[in-house]
Regions:
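Patatin-like phospholipase
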Residues: 1-172
Length: 172
């Protein structure tokens, strides 16, 4: 299981291998705390939830990194474009077996129309919501292009335009 967070200090998306961290917990009890912090950070939507501080060590000195929801960098991720090309350039053979990508996007792809109240906070909220939606679409296109380039079977599930349940509140 891979989970993404955003290191706000570095303005970088970080992908965590949660399986490896869980396995490390057998010999390193602090790995369980890191696992929990990553889970919290991955859901820490800026301004809605507090960021999560993660302890790190650089050149023998302790630091803390501020992590929030990985969606501030990428709504959906697969692997870096051109990864297979880079691996091949290093002389590593890549097995040519069939590969598939399955993406579950917990959102609609079409824009939702709404009258926007003429207030600063409402306008800002709607603008941020629009940014998030377009970033998500861009991420899907990027993953599709990567899948095509690498010969992967691309599969996408999302909430269709025919879904009409009433939205009562955020995070419901």
């Amino acid at each position: 299981l891979l989970i993404g967070t955003t290191n706000l200090d570095a303005r970088r998306g970080i992908v965590w291998n949660m399986g490896e961290i869980a396995m490390a917990a057998r010999d390193h009890p602090e790995a369980l705390d890191l696992f929990r912090k990553i889970m919290l950070a991955s859901a820490a939507i800026p301004a809605a939830f507090p960021p999560v501080m993660i302890d790190v060590e650089v050149n023998g000195k302790p630091y803390q990194e501020m992590h929030v929801d990985g969606g501030t960098q990428a709504q959906v991720f697969l692997y870096p474009p051109r990864m297979f090309d880079l691996i091949r350039q290093q002389g590593v053979k890549v097995n040519q077996r069939a590969r598939s990508v399955y993406i579950i996007r917990n959102a609609r792809l079409d824009p939702d129309w709404a009258t926007v109240e003429r207030s600063t906070l409402t306008i800002a909220g709607r603008a941020i919501s629009s940014l998030i939606q377009s970033q998500g679409l861009g991420d899907l296109y990027r993953i599709y292009a990567t899948a095509q380039q690498d010969g992967l079977d691309y599969n996408l599930a999302y909430i269709g335009a025919d879904f009409s349940a009433e939205h009562k509140e955020d995070f419901d």
